[in-house]
Curated annotation (Swiss-Prot):
Record PTM Phosphoserine, positions in chain: 241
Taxonomic lineage: Eukaryota, Metazoa, Chordata, Craniata, Vertebrata
Region of interest: Aspartate: 243-246
Single GO biological process annotation from the record: aspartyl-tRNA aminoacylation
A single GO molecular function term of this UniProt record: ATP binding
PROSITE patterns per record: AA_TRNA_LIGASE_II (PS50862)
Family note: Belongs to the class-II aminoacyl-tRNA synthetase family. Type 1 subfamily.
Name of the protein in its database record: Aspartate--tRNA ligase, mitochondrial
Binding annotation for L-aspartate: 265, 541
CDD domains to which the protein is assigned, alphabetical: AspRS_core, EcAspRS_like_N
Subunit comment: Homodimer.
Transit peptide: 1-46
Length: 652
């Protein structure tokens, strides 16, 4: 009987009209097309149910409904709560003998079993309504029930308040996905991507184009994953971004490109990164930096969740030099102050030795931050941690100065600070009672970077003491501009490397410096920062083949043969173009307030890059490797061999 009724319902669902579709003329596409966000979705079409568990209300009283879902919990064999991805509803289990089979099915099915229940929507008895549930005014009086799949004992309960280790969650990811938080995160992600696609493609004429996943190794950037081919010694690589392809699409006249792109970077064990990730990839012809910024601001405003405060555009901006000097980083969190102040002039005639030594050197400076109420809330062990952090990570000394409630200065160096220096320092730093000043000295960039780190450490410490510095409901966007085009290599300071990638165009006002002082050239690169996190980066590209060849070959010492296809394309009439990539995982993580990007990805890797559910990466037998002309040799060192846990299929 259940199969027959199910087929009848399915037939009705298939015959139901999906909705009228318009056939607009191409020229008026953006004016005529009905956006999908304006339609009411039908969640029960084409399936064996009439409604979802979360949609029933008092307006449905008396209706006969069929629901499908998981048994959330059962109480005294009288009620059970049925759950699907749309919500919860209470099922009243019949107690009369005529419905014994229904009662047996619903009472004997283990929790998390999948059932289909048909019945009548009735009002809950007066006083038994549950205001915490959207369906709390009604319940379903069950008439028929079918066990679709019984559930075995679970490794953990599917309840948000049940604490589970991340390793266990990743091992049983398909169970973790049933939680309301994961459901919310993934559905919000889907909605944001849908709105982004509408904004770009429907409203602004972008073309959604897939680019290849199998490519070749290219110079610069992050390490790439290699994919063997059947030709001896020849490998593909998984692209770290569609950078070259989207530039070639501009050469091909596509004008406006967009893609929800999968990208791959072999960066090893990093807790905040994934070896595979998703970015909203954008490229435009005949655009400048301002045009890209306006596009992205409109894109985020359009796709922003409705339950959040609307974004205010344009976003503020600052140069890389300003960000470093003020916040000590190129991705500042501007939700709170504690800005870096240059106090070199205050201590020009100081008797404090390490300040004297720093100011005597070229580009030597004295910098400080004021930690409001730091003297009141930070403890002795906190200050010791700060000083050790500075010494270990930056090989620099930090001088703490406290102003207590009686306006007395407390510091190991207090006796060496003159009254004039105190007054000027108080004025510049706007020091108040119970504040703490952290002071350091050295080369400008190093001193700023140290204080930028300490600024965040102090914010963390103060928030653990109960001070609210960073409002989680506030979304503070910032454009950072005018990055250096090149950086000195760490391993060889006399050589240059690209600060971002070698295709970034130099600032028009600095092109002449390419041939004399390339280290001073600014690039037309821009980063989008949200609450101290880089969520996007892009640039105006080099569209002149001669300039691109000069930068690759002469300045970066790269083998231009690896990029001959791109250089040739630029020679064939490449338009001026630029673009940006937004990190979708990071953006959704910040919007949802998730603790990790792994909480907004359906099937993420662990921080070591492993899939704990399937145990990937896995070993491969010699027979499977033979067509690729690959032989695995294990390390000879016994400890390395033990840590590698070799498979029985692979021998040295």
């Amino acid at each position: 009987m259940y199969l027959g009724s199910w087929l009848n319902r399915l037939g009705r669902g298939l015959s139901r009209p999906i909705g009228k579709t318009k056939q607009p003329i191409w020229g008026s596409l953006s004016r005529s097309l009905t956006l999908s966000s304006q339609r009411v979705p039908e969640f029960s079409s084409f399936v064996a149910r009439t409604n979802t568990c979360g949609e029933l209300r008092s307006s449905h009283l008396g209706q006969e409904v069929t629901l499908c879902g998981w048994i959330q919990y059962r109480r005294q064999n009288t009620f059970l709560v049925l759950r699907d991805c749309h919500g919860l509803v209470q099922i009243l289990i019949p107690q009369d003998e005529s419905a014994a089979s229904v009662r047996r099915t619903l009472c004997e099915a283990p929790v998390e079993s999948v059932v289909r229940v048909s019945g009548t929507v009735i009002a809950r008895p007066l006083g038994q309504e549950n205001p915490k549930m959207p369906t709390g005014e009604i319940e379903i009086k069950a008439k028929t029930a079918e066990l679709l799949n019984a559930c075995k004992k679970l490794p953990f309960e599917i309840k948000d308040f049940v604490k589970k280790t991340e390793a266990l969650r990743l091992q049983y990811r398909y169970l973790d996905l049933r939680s309301s938080q994961m459901q919310h995160n993934l559905r919000l992600r889907s909605q944001m991507v849908m709105k982004m696609r509408e904004y770009l493609c429907t409203l602004h004429g972008f073309v959604d184009i897939e680019t290849p996943t199998l490519f070749k190794r290219t110079p610069g950037g992050a390490k790439e994953f290699l994919v063997p081919s059947r030709e001896p010694g020849r490998f593909y690589s998984l692209p770290q971004s569609p950078q070259q392809f989207k530039q070639l699409l501009m050469v091909g006249g596509l004008d406006r490109y967009f893609q929800v792109a999968r990208c791959y970077r072999d960066e090893g064990s990093r807790p905040d990164r994934q070896p595979e990730f998703t970015q909203i990839d954008i490229e435009m012809s005949f655009v400048d930096q301002t045009g890209i910024q306006h596009l992205v601001e409109g894109l985020l405003h359009y796709s922003w969740p409705e339950d959040k405060d609307p974004l205010v555009a344009p976003f503020p901006s600052m140069t890389f030099a300003e960000a470093l000097a003020t916040y000590g980083t190129d991705k500042p969190d501007t939700r709170f102050g504690m800005k870096i102040v240059d106090i070199s002039d205050v201590f020009r005639n100081t008797e404090i030795r390490f300040l004297q030594d720093a100011l005597a050197k070229p580009q030597g400076t004295v910098k400080a931050i004021c930690v409001h109420e730091g003297a009141k809330y930070l403890r002795k062990e906190d200050i010791e941690f700060i000083r050790k952090f500075a010494a270990h990570h930056f090989s620099q000394e930090v001088l703490p100065i406290f102003l207590n409630a009686r306006k007395n200065w407390s510091s190991p160096f207090a006796k060496f600070i003159t009254e004039e220096e105190r007054l000027e320092l108080t004025r510049l730093m706007e020091i108040q009672e119970d504040d703490m000043v952290l002071l350091t000295a050295g080369q400008h960039e190093k001193a700023c970077s140290l204080l930028g780190k300490l600024r965040l450490e102090c914010a963390d410490l103060l928030e653990t003491r109960g001070l609210a510095l960073r409002d989680p409901a506030l979304f503070s966007f910032l454009w950072v501009l005018d990055f250096p085009l090149f950086l000195a290599k760490e391993e060889s300071p006399t050589e240059l490397e690209s600060a971002h990638h070698p295709f970034t165009a130099p600032h028009p006002g600095d092109i002449h410096l390419l041939y004399t002082e390339p280290e001073k050239v600014r690039g037309q690169h821009y980063d989008l920062v949200l609450n101290g996190n880089e969520i996007g980066g892009g640039s105006i590209r080099i569209h002149d083949a001669q300039l691109q060849r000069y930068i690759l070959e002469t300045l970066l010492k790269e083998d231009v043969k690896l990029l001959s296809h791109l250089l040739q394309a630029l020679d064939y009439g490449a338009p001026p173009h630029g673009g940006i990539a937004l990190g979708l995982d990071r953006l959704v993580c910040l919007v949802t307030g998730a603790p990790s990007i792994r909480d907004v990805i359906a099937f993420p890797k662990s921080y070591r890059g492993h899939d704990l559910m399937s145990n990937a990466p896995d070993t491969v037998s010699p027979e499977d490797l033979k067509p690729y002309h690959i032989h695995v040799s294990w390390p000879t060192d016994s400890e390395e061999r033990a840590s590698a846990t070799p498979s029985k299929y692979l021998s040295s």
